């Protein structure tokens, strides 16, 4: 995770995508692929499934961009909403089919450099020890750069709940990192 924070996604990009501008979709992909992938991974805990959900999210953004209503907020929140519902649908499909989703900590992208892989494994292993909602909140804030109020809106939780869970998660992560292996 070399790029920790991500700029707000411009609503203008979605307007251009709605008009069929493929260059705008490519620009959106460059800006949003990491936050989308990381959020999907925090839900699915399977790197291959997260990759699929990321691709499905971009297809859905392409199809749904004409229905997007600019609100003056970070458009990434809307896109991550699509990611959330796509990932949850994938989880339900897997459960109905009886297919176990493997831990993301067991998956390593072979294209990454060794150090990058090592960092991913450590990060995923530590994050896997958080509860699902805690992991989502941490990833959405730290990795995607969403503000707490945007996370509250996306996850349909109260802002004080998000803040409390975020602080508690950070304390839990700090304890996990300090514990001898």
PLM regions: where:
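Arg/Lys-rich amphipathic alpha helix in sigma70-family domain 2
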Residues: 63-70, 80-101, 116
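Structural recognition of an alpha-helix C-terminal capping motif at a helix-to-coil junction
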Residues: 38, 52-59, 73-85
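Amphipathic, Lys/Arg- and hydrophobic-enriched alpha-helical face
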Residues: 29-47, 64, 80, 127, ...
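DNA-recognition helix of helix-turn-helix
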Residues: 88, 134, 143, 148-180
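C-terminal edge and immediately downstream basic/flexible tail or linker adjoining helix-turn-helix-like DNA-binding
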Residues: 2-7, 16, 99, 139, ...
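Short, charged helix-capping/linker segments at alpha-helix termini
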Residues: 2-4, 18-27, 37-56, 180-181
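Internal acidic/polar
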Residues: 6-10, 89, 96-120
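Sigma70-family region 2
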Residues: 18-19, 45, 56-73, 93-94
